[in-house]
Amino acid sequence: MARINVVVSFLAALAVVQAAQLLNLDGQKDAVPGSYVVVMNDGLSGLDFESHVKSMAKVQKANALKRDFDNTADGVKFKYNINGWQAYSGKFDNKTIQSILDDPRVNYIEPQRTFRAFGWVTQDNAPSWGLGRISHTSRGRMDYVYDSSAGENVTVYSVDSGVDISHPEFEGRAIWGVNAADNSDVDQIGHGTHTSGTIAGKTYGVAKMAKIVAVKVLDAGGQGTNGGIIQGINWAVNHARQNNVTGKAVMNMSFGGGLSRAINEAASSAVRAGIFMVAAAGNNNEDARYTTPASARGVCAVGASTQNDLKARFSNWGPTLAVYAPGDRIWSAMPDGGRDVMRGTSMAAPHVAGVAAVLISSEKIGTDRLCERIKELSVSSIQSPGADTTDKLLYNGSGQ
């Protein structure tokens, strides 16, 4: 009898250890009430995943009936499979969340929070200097020198607020991909058009022959959620596979927020799928290890520098940064054929995405080696980079 009790106690303890975890946010100010991302255990079959989702949909429906058809919690919105990483997101009531937690197929549940664009401050009549800086080892030059391949046959996914794909800057090389933010398939704030112009615009772009695919995850307020962002990443990975561009694809993420385990895991899964991931480090002058998606494993995190090779006062810093790039007073495209100047790590990241696209086309380098190659080429120029932070400034290796 004693042996049976020991076995029962062990199994009970094992069940506790294996129970799914409901993660807490580091502060609730960015929380989206009642919205969650549910992440499944590694190795779960597709059939088991679908079985779980259907089961929880029934639970949600039953709970809704008990609430007298209150639709404030409306169930699954997005399902994800990013290189084997499986999850889903939506709105669920507390009873449904408890049922999800009790399912042994679930790894953890993360409350949804908002993430924001990292480039907002504008200043009229500022000079455009970033292209000249990244193609010379010393500052002060305004000419842009680059390899003639110019990112040709490379696809860059602009995960942002959308892109004005008809803007003359893109010369027909930009297409609309997916909208995971709202019901408006346009760039309402200009942020995504600006960053994409830096990546691949004919005038302002680093990789002037690369293709842009608009993946909208930020709404008219410049905000998005865990679920929408992961949906954008999921869509981009599937699109890259369907179009045979894995290994020749870049994803730029000029946004961020507090730590999200789910987004970080989704981004890392995209890296393993053959997408080179670039992320803005953030604009809070703090350690980027506590910012998502810049802190994700395998993501190339970028801080912002000034025209004087200083760390921009707003830029995040820390050991997670791969490199600094121009991010202060950057001119680029805006919707309806316009142009404007912005500053932020949002403006720095697309310089790196553009250089990555050029390196893929010119050196035929694999996406798994790109961040290291970019760091190899970069020059030690940043003054006062921050504690435990690289002093490397982006350089495209032009020889100038």
Curated annotation (Swiss-Prot):
Q: Where is the signal peptide?
A: 1-19
> Cross-referenced SUPFAM superfamilies, in alphabetical order?
Protease propeptides/inhibitors, Subtilisin-like
Q: What is its EC number?
A: 3.4.21.-
What's in the keyword line of the UniProt record?
Glycoprotein, Hydrolase, Protease, Secreted, Serine protease, Signal, Virulence, Zymogen
Q: Where in the cell is it found?
A: Secreted
Which residues are in the Inhibitor I9 domain?
Answer: 35-116
Every copy of the Peptidase S8 domain together lies at: 128-400
Which residues does UniProt mark as catalytic? D160, H191, S346
Pfam families according to UniProt: Inhibitor_I9, Peptidase_S8
Please give the residues making up the propeptide in this record: 20-118
Q: Which InterPro entries match?
A: PCSK9_ProteinaseK-like, Peptidase_S8/S53_dom, Peptidase_S8/S53_dom_sf, Peptidase_S8_Ser-AS, Peptidase_S8_subtilisin-like, Peptidase_S8_subtilisin-rel, S8pro/Inhibitor_I9, S8pro/Inhibitor_I9_sf
List the carbohydrate attachment sites. Answer: N153, N244, N252, N396
Give the GO terms filed under biological process for this record.
proteolysis
Q: What does this protein do?
A: Secreted subtilisin-like serine protease with keratinolytic activity that contributes to pathogenicity.
Q: Which family does it belong to?
A: Belongs to the peptidase S8 family.
Q: Which PANTHER family match?
A: CEREVISIN-RELATED (PTHR43806:SF11), PEPTIDASE S8 (PTHR43806)
Q: What is this protein called?
A: Subtilisin-like protease CPC735_047380
Organism of this sequence: Coccidioides posadasii (strain C735)
